[in-house]
């Protein structure tokens, strides 16, 4: 059975539509109106092996906050929908990914409990036109509505773009491993994953 999540959300601030296929080929068709977010979503799809379609429209004349956060929210819900009851998942995984001088590690638990620890170290206020304070906001919404735990640590790096990009790549590689199917049993001593 295909592991697919597809949904949309419309509010007075945003309209977001996401289709996510867990067992994809890493294809991305993304347009959010926020260039750096599009870049990060392309990276997430490519390195996780998931196929991702995202369309978002938001009140970016105010700022990018609502669009970025709501994209994370709908993406999380789509992942949650695609993973079903999670009983056959490997569940836990981690990955360290370098990008030139930057190194990040992501550890994930797809066991149904939402938590985010995000340590990027100091970042400038912006990467291009992207407000860097929105990066953890995106991750917070993604983990909360995707019902998973993420510990993301950027160990070091001088270039803010490299630090954030290595973090997203590490998350993607960890997700790729964690969504793999177990050959038998459930990744919980309780017998259920919740």
Swiss-Prot record:
Which Gene3D superfamilies does the record cross-reference, listed alphabetically? Imidazole glycerol phosphate dehydratase, domain 1 (3.30.230.40)
GO molecular function terms noted in the UniProt entry: imidazoleglycerol-phosphate dehydratase activity
State the reactions this protein catalyses.
D-erythro-1-(imidazol-4-yl)glycerol 3-phosphate = 3-(imidazol-4-yl)-2-oxopropyl phosphate + H2O
The record's Pfam families line, in alphabetical order, gives: IGPD
The Enzyme Commission number assigned here is 4.2.1.19
Q: Which residues cross the membrane?
A: none
Q: Which GO terms describe its cellular component?
A: cytoplasm
Any single GO BP term: L-histidine biosynthetic process
List UniProt keywords, sorted A-Z: Amino-acid biosynthesis, Cytoplasm, Histidine biosynthesis, Lyase
InterPro entries, sorted: IGPD_sf (IPR038494), ImidazoleglycerolP_deHydtase (IPR000807), ImidazoleglycerP_deHydtase_CS (IPR020565), Ribosomal_Su5_D2-typ_SF (IPR020568)
Alphabetical list of NCBIfam families matching this protein: PRK00951.2-4
* The family this protein is said to belong to: Belongs to the imidazoleglycerol-phosphate dehydratase family.
What name does the UniProt record give this protein?
Imidazoleglycerol-phosphate dehydratase
Gene name of this polypeptide = hisB
